[in-house]
Amino acid sequence: MSLNDNTNLSSHTPMMQQYLRLKAEHPEILLFYRMGDFYELFYDDAKRASQLLEISLTKRGSSAGEPIPMAGVPYHAVENYLAKLVHLGESVAICEQIGDPALSKGPVERKVVRIVTPGTISDEALLNERQDNLLAAIWQSTRGFGYATLDISSGRFRLAEPTDRETMAAELQRTNPAELLYPEDFAAMDLIENRRGLRRRALWEYELDTARQQLNLQFATRDLSGFGVEQAHHALRAAGCLLQYVKDTQRTSLPHIRSLTIERQQDGIIMDAATRRNLEITQNLAGGSDNTLASVLDKTVTPMGSRMLKRWLHMPLRNAQTIALRQQSIRTLQDLNDSLPPLLRQVGDLERILARLALRTARPRDLARMRHAFQQLPQLNNELADSDNAHLQTLRSQMGEFTELRELLEHAIVETPPVLVRDGGVIAPGYNQELDEWRALADGATDYLDRLEIREREKLGLDTLKVGFNGVHGYYIQVSRGQSHLVPIHYVRRQTLKNAERYIIPELKEYEDKVLTSKGKALSLEKALYEQLFDRLLPHLAALQDSAAALAELDVLTNLAERAWTLNYSCPTLSDKPGIKLTGGRHPVVEQVLKDPFIANPLSLSPQRRMLVVTGPNMGGKSTYMRQAALITLMAHIGSFVPAEQAIIGPIDRIFTRVGAADDLASGRSTFMVEMTETANILHNATEYSLVLMDEIGRGTSTYDGLSLAWACAESLANRIKAMTLFATHYFELTTLPEQIEGVANVHLDAVEHGDTIAFMHSVQEGAASKSYGLAVAALAGVPKDVIKRARQKLKELEALSGSAASTRADGSQLPLLVEETSPAVEALEALDPDSLSPRQALEWIYRLKSLV
């Protein structure tokens, strides 16, 4: 039976009636219904949870004549189960008991106190500390898209208005939201259908006027012109839907969301989804984080610094002034690299602690960590005090010291607080006199009980008399069964044991009531004092958030300074003249993975040398050479130093890569279709200021189709678009392009054959490669010798069929399509005169030719 079958509430027990009413308010998400020490789920929720969480599915009696499916999780372990559900893209409504069971005539009063969704979590246990966790909303019209993202764990609110599908796909790839809200009539479902955490929303939630009202109310403004988003109608619709969703799920004010920013394409270097994937910036092609650019560059010591660095990597800047400030700071911080990281490490994740403070969900240990962070600020300020770097002084000023707040927390919170306020013992002794008095009363019970036991034992002469406490029956006086007949009449029996009797007397009962009252009073007062701490901290929230942002940036810059020093990076020069010139360029990731020294290579692109046709053997390093150019360019535009002896980089507006491909089975697209789609995107959107990497265009179809496509694409990039292009190919016909198109040059990666083996030199040389070494690479890979031998025979046949090992060039002249390897046996036969041989000599020649073959 499903929940929907139970429409007649009167046929259910009172408790199930309460559950069904609450569930009706949250029909699409799981409801965790608190019952004692467990959160229970019923009906379809129970079945779903048992599968997702791999917990037992049981039954709880029956209601309306049917057995009720039930599953449950213990309340003390709920965070682990919530983390698993959130990771799977599920949302959960948490229903707590808010009434007093002792005063309730029917079921204890319950209500949903919070809703946990993948995009709105702020609990430390549910978050990946080194990765942003974003909630996003999307809107679409005939004129483009609106897109809004919010990191509720920091308050960072961003808008964008992608104009086309490719740009929207790139934004989704860049931001990778944990939860995505979309309107019920959303047309471009293929863009989002494979994403996690999808939430379908009603159209009215995207109403523009309502969005403006919501945002003005949140920011306490009359209009949104101060944020520069007044005309961003599509993005505002998405932002309004997103903000209302957060308010509905969090059920509290959101003071840490203080502003919103629109991100415009012209502010940064644009990279489409394929480029971000191919460059393996934060995620490798297998979906992991090993051997990515972030894995090499991210040695930050705070989680908030790690998250900021990843945002920088995914949004390289075009603002030369900001980049220069970062470069100067990195240069200065190389001298402070020993002293700052240990201090910054102690700061921890202040950004997310402040978000929990704003949501009033911060736990005692959050406040202890905040206190510890404040304690590092004076020393951090001292370390930067003597620097003449203007940007570092700005960060120093923004960090502040918060002496008053530090002293408040030092006075208010114990050194090592418990996990939860309800456990008690959070507020430090001496902070509040009334609390100290109640605690003294509760804590004095042991002394009182010892005195009472001695007094009663001596007065009655009962050597077996003991005074104790039991969690069920409370305080008691215990006497052995053999002496129980000697107790006075005012001893009232409370419990009978096998060998003893337990009693209560009026004096002990009075003291018990007093102690229990004092414990309750102390805990109640402690909770109130804890809430008052929030009230005293929250007025400083804006300054605290600015401080956290400054500390995160200082961590990133210090980290990049350490990376530059440790990995021998140099400071790049950003020029206003078009082109890229690298001396001794290295791939930042590959050089860390290799056991052998990395072979550094130059790169020279300019308006007079716009395209390099890159040839050479498979495994020779063509893809590495191309990718390192893109990664060095990207690193330079986040302000980082780069792996090169020298780097001079001109204006760049976009980076495109067409490097490798796999079948997109989910969309029904073959490898070749994926390749052509990515190529079309480049040809439509690249400009003369773009950096384009094209690797093996046309290999997914027949030889002549592929060659024709590769030729035409190269011509378009060099003649029409004039983009800075690295064009790797196995089509040797393309090496004639420099003879026909101005601004095109050949380079190749060298290799040397030694008999049946091949040595890759990984060194970039001017000019075209002499051959592809395909069969040599196959032999190196372990292809059986008989297969290699057969391949050589077949190669000769194909070369013969194509016209004496030559194929027609695209311009009508001749060029070998497959380079022929001359056989020693053929050379010997060509030099032989059969008419001059004796029978014995002919036999000897047969054996010699056999050995040559």
UniProtKB/Swiss-Prot annotation:
This protein is involved in the repair of mismatches in DNA. It is possible that it carries out the mismatch recognition step. This protein has a weak ATPase activity. The keyword Ubl conjugation does not apply. It comes from the Bacteria. One of its GO terms (molecular function) is mismatched DNA binding. It holds the Pfam family MutS_II. PANTHER family: DNA MISMATCH REPAIR PROTEIN MSH1, MITOCHONDRIAL, DNA MISMATCH REPAIR PROTEIN MUTS FAMILY MEMBER. CDD domains: ABC_MutS1 (cd03284). Coiled coil: none annotated. This is DNA mismatch repair protein MutS. ATP binds at residues 616-623. GO terms for cellular component: cytosol. One of its GO terms (biological process) is mismatch repair. Keywords: ATP-binding, DNA damage, DNA repair, DNA-binding, Nucleotide-binding. Belongs to the DNA mismatch repair MutS family. InterPro entries: DNA_mismatch_repair_MutS, DNA_mismatch_repair_MutS-lik_N, DNA_mismatch_repair_MutS/MSH, DNA_mismatch_repair_MutS_C, DNA_mismatch_repair_MutS_clamp, DNA_mismatch_repair_MutS_core, DNA_mismatch_repair_MutS_N, DNA_mismatch_repair_MutS_sf.
